[in-house]
């Protein structure tokens, strides 16, 4: 009965709402002015580092990657073969039948937040809804939610409450713009080879559950009309999360360009007005140019900027070399590489979001925990060179060239290896931090060449290595600032603290 009421309300709702947009006026400048919105919150400028996770029904197979829900329906894909061997033919055992298998029986929000805080994160997030149509909160919009099915727990509620108890900001990420089946079996002459690859997550096939007319299955697989989707589902879920969980950041994955502008505007207006009422600074992350910069912030994926940006920006990395969700064969990245990514991002006026990949039962594997704790150990010593800093006049120097581009070159970014001669700079007050992306040889004289342009302006008082009690011998020359490298422990980046008057 409860599911029937969900569906009845959903399909009666959109008809009365469509007409409201006929005379709807959109003024993106006005919307930010009226809400007195700052798209670059000071707390986020100071925070620098957040941790979030991809975790949901797609974690159950622990195979391939988080697009398993889509690829399991494609007969030419390895995911289809795997699903057929382990669960049954997707025609009979669809993604909907995986939902009860996501039990999260060992999920402990406090343990997760404790871990993220020990790792040095200043905000925490979660994928609120991926492309798969399953909401990770107690939803009245869709029956496909974890409070009603699977774990029967309000995951976002438990997690966000713990974040707030720990004094951490809350981020929710939304990927549900792709849920709507936009083309089904129609022709797309403008994209003859790829029309069904990306714009809709679940492939429409008359042989598969994705084409079912069952009211429940239609909701999960996005087999609904645009009128049934944009207002009551896409926008409705966002409003529900804002009302019930009060996130500080809302992140959108790609494909916002597929959402009609009036719905983007209504979301933005709702979120910013809600923040104003609550007297809180919030942020909206978006990829590409799907929202104006006066109301949003750019986020990159597995890539970074070449130079210092005047506006605050963000990028997301994952703890593995490939999948965002847990898989049995996932290969993990080294903590020292992720520390260097964080340093590089911060030196260019950026913020890093690091993704972790819990198992479907709610355990974050020990190998991932060790990486996080290594990052936290480094930040415990060197955090003053990261948190609350701002870019110097130049981001850094050194022999290593960075790939050009965004996600299309993410594999090249992954291969990037820095040396001890690669340096990144941050600043706070009258202090400049020179961070080497490796450990230089003890006793070596190292020259920070970027200081040669600052000889007349800077009056250096002391140079030291953070974590060491000894002062470092230094000399300001026409080549730059020369320092003698002391003996240091560990294999991670070291920070020279240069105190000026």
Residue ranges and their predicted role:
Residues 1-22:
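Bacterial Sec-dependent N-terminal signal peptides
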Residues 20-501:
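Mature catalytic domains of secreted/periplasmic carbohydrate-active enzymes
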């Amino acid at each position: 009965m409860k599911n029937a009421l969900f569906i009845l309300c959903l399909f009666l709702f959109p008809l009365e709402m469509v007409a409201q947009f006929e005379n709807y006026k959109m003024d993106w400048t006005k919307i930010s002015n009226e809400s007195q919105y700052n798209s670059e919150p000071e707390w986020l400028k100071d925070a620098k580092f957040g941790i979030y996770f991809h975790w949901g029904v797609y974690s159950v197979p622990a195979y391939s990657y988080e697009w398993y829900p889509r690829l399991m329906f494609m007969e030419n894909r390895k995911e289809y073969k795997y699903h057929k061997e382990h669960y049954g033919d997707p025609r009979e055992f669809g993604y909907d039948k995986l939902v009860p298998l996501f039990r999260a029986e060992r999920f402990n929000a406090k343990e997760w937040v404790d871990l993220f805080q020990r790792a040095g994160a200043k905000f925490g997030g979660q994928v609120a809804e991926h492309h798969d149509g399953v909401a990770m909160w107690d939803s009245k919009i869709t029956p496909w939610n974890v409070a009603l099915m699977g774990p029967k727990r309000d995951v976002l509620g438990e997690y966000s409450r713990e974040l707030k108890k720990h004094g951490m900001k809350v981020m929710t990420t939304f990927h549900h713009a792709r849920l709507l089946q936009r083309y089904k079996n129609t022709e797309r002459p403008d994209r003859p080879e790829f029309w069904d690859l990306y714009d809709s997550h679940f492939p429409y096939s008359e042989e598969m559950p994705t084409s079912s007319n069952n009211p429940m299955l239609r909701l999960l697989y996005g087999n609904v009309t645009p009128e049934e989707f944009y207002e009551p589902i896409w926008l409705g879920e966002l409003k529900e999360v804002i009302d019930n969980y009060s996130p500080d950041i809302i992140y959108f994955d790609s494909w916002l360009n597929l959402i009609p502008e009036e719905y983007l505007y209504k979301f933005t207006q709702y979120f910013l007005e809600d923040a104003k009422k609550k007297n809180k600074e919030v942020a909206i992350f978006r990829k590409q140019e799907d929202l104006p910069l006066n109301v949003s912030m750019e986020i990159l994926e597995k890539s970074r900027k070449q130079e210092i940006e005047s506006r605050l920006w963000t990028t997301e990395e994952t703890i593995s070399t490939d999948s965002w969700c847990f898989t049995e064969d996932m290969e993990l990245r080294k903590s020292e590489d992720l520390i260097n990514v964080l340093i590089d991002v911060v030196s260019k006026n950026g913020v890093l979001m690091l993704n972790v990949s819990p198992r479907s039962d709610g355990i974050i594997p020990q190998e991932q925990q060790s990486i996080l704790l290594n990052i936290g150990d480094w930040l415990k010593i060197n955090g003053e060179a990261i948190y609350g800093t701002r870019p110097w006049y130049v981001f850094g120097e050194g022999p290593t060239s960075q790939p050009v581009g965004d996600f299309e070159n993410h594999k090249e970014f992954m291969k990037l290896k820095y040396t001890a001669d690669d340096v990144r700079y941050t600043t706070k007050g009258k202090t400049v931090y020179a961070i080497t992306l490796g450990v230089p040889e003890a006793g070596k004289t190292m020259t920070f060449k970027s200081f040669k342009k600052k000889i007349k302006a800077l009056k250096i008082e002391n140079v030291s290595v953070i974590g060491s009690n000894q002062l470092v011998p230094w000399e300001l020359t026409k080549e730059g600032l020369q320092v003698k490298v002391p003996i240091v422990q560990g294999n991670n980046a070291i920070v020279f603290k240069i105190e000026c008057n």
